[in-house]
Amino acid sequence: MKKTLLLCAFLVGLVSSNVMALTLDEARTQGRVGETFYGYLVALKTDAETEKLVADINAERKASYQQLAKQNNVSVDDIAKLAGQKLVARAKPGEYVQGINGKWVRKF
């Protein structure tokens, strides 16, 4: 329960960051990035701006996952996968997510 509450607080923080969220939202709606079940973004377009955004966000996510894992005595991979499931589930229509089979699909 504690792990879920901490993860929810982390996810709210990700979305509410004014500068990052707007840029991330734009990238999502433009089909430039996609969410995975592993908790990290993937650049679907290989331009420098998109790749930098993905690298920056994934670095922030990894740091948060490491902190949560340490606090809850679980693996970083477990935290990342839990976050990934929630991020994929919360993706809006038109945004890309990677299915369990590894294929990219646009949510509808």
UniProtKB/Swiss-Prot annotation:
Changes seen on gene knockout: The deletion mutant does not show any growth or outer membrane permeability defects.
Signal peptide (residue range): 1-21
Compartmental location: Periplasm
Keywords from the UniProt entry: Periplasm, Signal
Any Pfam family hit: DUF1318
Keyword Signal: yes
Function noted in UniProt: Probably acts as a chaperone-like protein that contributes to, but is not required for, the formation of the YdbH-YnbE intermembrane bridge. Affects the function and the structure of the YdbH-YnbE complex. Overexpression of ydbL causes a negative effect on YdbH-YnbE function.
Name of the featured protein: Probable chaperone-like protein YdbL
High-level lineage: Bacteria, Pseudomonadati, Pseudomonadota, Gammaproteobacteria, Enterobacterales
Name of the gene: ydbL
